[in-house]
Amino acid sequence: MQTTPSIDPTLEWFLSHCHIHKYPSKSTLIHAGEKAETLYYLIKGSVAVLVKDEDGKEMILTYLSQGDFFGEAGLFEEGQLRSAWIKAKSPCEIAEISYKKFRQLIQVNPDILMHLSAQLARRLQNTSRQVSNLAFLDVTGRIAQTLLNLAKMPEAMTHPDGMQIKITRQEIGQMVGCSRETVGRILKMLEDQHLISAHGKTIVVYGTR
């Protein structure tokens, strides 16, 4: 069951200086190619970070959930353009603040920059693991690893047999770089091995908590 963690005093202070907005599921929050001027903080919900090729085919790079910053690239180098699309995976409540105002807050309380920096370091580690998985794991391994990662996210729900997640076969394919049909075949194989159960968008990953 998803819970809302108690908020850190520094983050609470930071949020008091932000504009808070709510977005419905499937809303596009950031468009690739637009000028980067705003930092975002996810209070509730989850978003997908994705890129598109010239034909409009999407690849999901990662999911972000409550407590995550995003849109930070232009904070450190002016004139940056957004490099990825951000879309709401579920209804979201998001704090938004201009880079200019955030830089002013850093002067008052540098701890907020440490929060952001710690997240960026963890995200870099996750990206390194993702690149390694793409290079060294076959598609079955990539899908299995993706399911394990999703089972650890805040929106995963406890289930008597493990953790329950909601994701489509198309979304899994966009994350690991394969077709929806391939995902379906591998999920069936994982079911036959009694590692998961999959019914529509609902997947239970056994033995995870």
From Swiss-Prot:
Segments forming domain HTH crp-type: 137-209
Residues annotated to bind 3',5'-cyclic AMP 1: G56, K57, E58, M59, I60, L61, T62, G71, E72, A73, R82, S83, T127, S128
Q: Which InterPro entries match?
A: cNMP-bd_CS, cNMP-bd_dom, cNMP-bd_dom_sf, Env_Response_Regulators, HTH_CRP, RmlC-like_jellyroll, Tscrpt_reg_HTH_Crp-type_CS, WH-like_DNA-bd_sf
Where is the site labelled Activating region 2 (AR2)? E96, K101
CC terms in the record's Gene Ontology section: cytosol
The disulfides recorded in the entry are none
DNA-binding region extent: 179-185
Q: Mark the residues carrying the PTM N6-acetyllysine.
A: K100
Q: Which Gene3D superfamilies match?
A: Jelly Rolls, Winged helix-like DNA-binding domain superfamily/Winged helix DNA-binding domain
Quote the record's domain comment. Answer: The N-terminal domain binds cAMP and is responsible for homodimerization, while the C-terminal domain binds DNA when cAMP is bound.
Functionally, this protein is described as follows: A global transcription regulator. Complexes with cyclic AMP (cAMP) which allosterically activates DNA binding to regulate transcription. It can act as an activator, repressor, coactivator or corepressor. Induces a severe bend in DNA. Acts as a negative regulator of its own synthesis as well as for adenylate cyclase (cyaA), which generates cAMP. Plays a major role in carbon catabolite repression (CCR).
Q: What is this protein called?
A: cAMP-activated global transcriptional regulator CRP
Q: Cite the source lineage.
A: Bacteria, Pseudomonadati, Pseudomonadota, Gammaproteobacteria, Pasteurellales
